Each structure stands twice: as structure tokens, then as C-alpha cells.
């Protein structure tokens, strides 16, 4: 507030108000303000007339300005007397005006006026109460400025009463009516507040108090400055701004500059009043009233000059209604102008968005309903049947299937035929099919590999099963008299036999396909192996020095006794006269408890005896009927021929493959092979040299 008061005291404002046509404005002096306000009112009212009337009126205004300059120094007493007289006339004329216009009959506007008058009056009192202290201090220090403030107060709160004096001099009653209508516009809020209190005398006293106190000038000027800074510009603002004449482009005299600045301030003040609107409140009513006023304004231009007064009065009445309906609260509008503008924009955007969304939703709903209707037609009849009806149909079909079998099959064939007809197939027949040319390739005859399946001897599994019954037990321990384990045999044929000392004598193992392995051990803690025997015809016995004592296979047998003649025989060739099995048996005594006798392939008897206890097992094997071809081969096998081991057998196979490759390879292939081998050998030598250099 202090900054605004300092600006009003005569200093230029730091941020001058901006308007669409003027970039900068200077505050006028006291006398200039009065002249500007009076001239602006006359110019605004006479703006709808023709350009010739405007030029005459401009001359009259210049004369009026000279008269007003003479009357400025008459004093406060004359204005106070005129105020009382004019105040009474104002109230009488306003009542007549209100009765004619019919505003008193409209209850809605009266309620709005009462509400707005209450708020505006209370806020003005609060605002004036806050500024009393600051304004009184400035009032004491500035006596010369008080006269200016008094004059400005008279002009602001008397409702442009100077226009009434000018009209009395000119004798224009129609102009008085227009001025009274304008007074009603500016003082409507204060009058409604006084009407609520039902004290017209109190209203006059308040006006006099306002006139006497200089604080009102500050408030009025601050109001004008705030309105000048407001950025809002509605349709009513544009029309009021255009009424300002542009003939004051050369501000040589002081009165012309004052008039221009005062006119701008008053136009901004009215623009701010028009902008203090809530567009959400009776927006349609305001638009209708405005359109009505515009149409009536167009009709007034066509009427005679005598009818201009009545049309202008009617236009002023409608503009009065517009401004009254748009003003909710003057002080709230000053402080919240930008906020109201943002709210209006948000409202418009929300309104458009909501209408667009509703239309979009309705379209989608219609499309969905249309799709649902289309889907209803595609529902098969089976889905429409209820569960009970379907169940009944199934029962009837089961009972009467034979009767309707032919019809059901006919329907199925028809449906299948329909499905086949729906599937279209295009077939193309060429006149002549091109025969694919096969590349000529030299046929290389590969050698036919003859695979000789090795015929093996097959064991007699039935005989082996009967033989193993002997050493199948129930898994019970049989002990010696000294409580050591004697033997334990299990139902699957496995078991153990122990010496009286407790050492293991024989271990019987079982593998798949009824393959048993018998291991005979020495009676010692070391437990050296004395014999390995299996039921496939292979066996090896070792003497005390761990040398081979006897070796048996499926074809041959070797016996290497000490200090005796060695024997070798073929089990399948009995023409060789050798004193060996199966002609002559061989007995081997391993220790005092174990003795083995070899009679034939199927009779290798193992005996374990201790005092009166004895266990005898047959460790031999028997083969099925041998084919003569196999038998002849087995007979031809020499006795001293060594059977190759697994590694030797692999080497023999590889050598045979190499032999076959060399037989069918050509000389160029061999030459290429030799070159590749020589290169690889050279590379190996070079690598070895490099490695040797690296190490050393």
C-alpha cells in the first residue's frame, strides 16, 4: 500500500500500465484528472454519433474545459451545497429510472445486488480502516495535495456530477439522463448496501464523510492503478476502449495531456469492472443481454437525431445490467484477476473434453451392441439347448440309434462333402515335363566286405542252474567247534568258505547271465590267490611260488608240473595221444584242506575237508550241441598256438584295414599320401627344433 501511495503522490510508477494501443502512461495532476474524467464521459456517451457530431462536441468540450478551469478554485463549500442538491436529484431520478427500466421488479438481480453490495461495502470498510494510519500521516505532511484529493473525491464519488453542471450550461436534458445512468452504474454497490440498512440519511452522511476525508482519494487512485495493471480484456473492454478519441496526439497544452491520461485511466477502470466476472455464473444470460444491446445499438444509428437520447439510455441500461451481472466482488476481482482467467480456460477445456468423451463413449457402446447382435446370430443351436434337453436327446439317440443310423451317416457325409467343396484347389497340367539331367559320374565299385560272424560256443544254462543248486543255501552260518565261521551260502549261489583259523578259503561271486566266479585263497593273513575259475570253461591255478600251475580254456588245456613232463591237449580232438583229460584226470592239492580234480570240461571238482566235514563243488561247464563246422574248426586249432590278447587283437584289425585300402588305392593316391606324410614329418622335426631352442 505504501508503494501505491507513493506513486499517487506524484512520482511516476516503476511499472506503467500497458494497454493494446498505448505503451506508457503518466499520472495526471489534480486539475487535469477532473477535466479528463468529465471529457471522457462526454466522449464515451457521444461516440455512437456521426463524425460531424464528434467534432462539434470536441469544440464544446474545449469550451467546457476552460469553464471548468475557472470553476476549479471556487472552493469546497459550493461543491458541498451542490452535492446535497444533486444527491437529492440523483436519488429521485434513479428511482424513476429504476421504475421505468423494471429492475426493481426483477428479484433475481436485486438478490445479487444485495449480496454483492454487502461484500463490497464490508471489504471497502476493512480496506479503508487499514489505510487510515498511513494516509493520515501523508495528509499531515501534504496540505497542497489535500485540495487535489478533495477535488478527485468529488469527481469519483459524486458519480461524475461535473457533467450535470456542464449539461445545465448547455441545456441538454438527455445528457443528464445518461449521466444519471452512469452514476447508477458506479454507485450501485454502495446504494444497495445502504438500502439493506434502510437508512438513506446515513448514506448521505457516509458520502459526506468520504468527501471530507482525503483517504478516499488514495483508495480510488489505487483502484485505478490496479485496474490498469490487470491483463484481462473481455468483449466489453474492447468497446469501451474504442470510444476514446485519438485526436489528442499532440499534447502541447496541459489540458490535452491531462484529458488523455484521465481517459485512459477511466477506460481501464471500466475494463477492470467488466473483467471482474465469473463466467460460470449466468453466462447465457449475459450473452443474451449483450447481443440484445448490440442489436439495439445498430437500430439507433438508423433513427432520427431526436430518438438518439432514448436509444442511448436503453443501451446504457442494458450495459448496466451486463456490468452488474458480471461483478461479484470488486476487491476479490482486483486481487484474483489472473486466477479467474485461468479458471475460465480450465472450465472451457473441461467442458469441451467432457462433451467429446461422452460422444466417444456412446459411439463405442453402439459399436459393442452391434457386435453383440452379430455374435448372437452365430451361436450354434447346441449351445441354446439346456442341459436337461441335451441329456434327453442323448438317451433317445442311444435307444433309437439303429433306426436313425442311416440318416445320421447321410448327414455326416453331406457335411463332409460341404467342407470339401469349401476348400478350393487349383491343379495345373504342363504339356511336357522336363526330364532332369543327371550328371555323368563314374561308378566306382566298392569292394564287398565279407563279414564273418564268429561262431561261439553256447553254454548249457539248464545244466549250470542244476549244478548251482548244490551251493545255494539259506544264508545261515555254519561254525567250527572253536566258534569260527565255517561256511555261509546264500540262495542266489554266492557264499564263503573259511579255514579253521578264520581266514577266507573260497569266495563265490555271481554276475549276470548266470556267470559265477570262484576265487581260492591261501591260508594266511596275506590271502594270496591260488586259483581263479569261472563257469565259462576258463581256469588258472598257481603254485606256492605264484607260478602258473594249470591253465584251461574252452578249447585247450596246459599243465606245468614241477620236475615232470608238461602236458597240452585239445578238448575237441582226442586223436592226439596225451595222458591228459578227458582221457586221464589231473589232481591238484593246493593245501591240506583243498584239493581239485580235473576230469573233463564239465567235471572240475573242488573239495574242502576238515576232519569229518567236507564240501564238494563242481566248477566245470557244459556246452550245447556243437555244429560240425565249429567242431572241425576247433579240432584244427593247434595246441601251441597262442591266443592274442585284446591289444593284439586291435592291432590285427587295423593292419587288415590298411591292407585292404592299399589293395584298392591307385598310384597317384599313394604319391599324394607319401608327400603328405613327408611334409608332416618335416613339420614335426621343425617343431621339435623350435621347442629345443626354447627350452635351452
UniProtKB/Swiss-Prot annotation:
Gene name, Swiss-Prot/TrEMBL: ERICH6B
Family note: Belongs to the ERICH6 family.
Location of region: Disordered: 1-105
Protein name as annotated: Glutamate-rich protein 6B
Organism for this UniProt entry: Homo sapiens (Human)
Compositionally skewed regions (Polar residues) per UniProt: 1-10
InterPro entries membership: FAM194_C
Disulfide bond residue pairs: none
Skewed-composition ranges (Acidic residues): 32-44, 54-72
